[in-house]
Amino acid sequence: MVPISVTIEREHPSIGIITLVGEHDAYSAGRIANEIEVLLDTGLPVVIDLTEATFVDSQTLSTLLSARHQAHAANLGFTLVLPDDRFTQVHRILRMTGLASWFATYPSMTEARDAARAGHTSGGRLKVA
């Protein structure tokens, strides 16, 4: 099973953090969608930590994009953590698909948490080249 961890930080306001490690494809996309749905249904902003993710396929991207739209509609933050100190397959995929600008993506957990708590769902500081 591909590692996915879910953490709820109880600082005010509370926030849900989902950490993805390794490669994620259609096999794990369903579980990711379920975890995000639980957090959004609870009214929590969501941070997806992609720091240790090495690959995400189109199904996983679709899951993240759908969740971003759900969060936006519910006025909840939805951000991604993707450090810019190394260029990964995830960076490349976001750039190639043109989806980089659709997500609020930040190079550090601190920035992503703050932005999610502020209700951000797009923008951010992702470097894609």
Predicted feature locations:
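STAS-like cytosolic regulatory interaction modules
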Residues: 1-52, 66-129
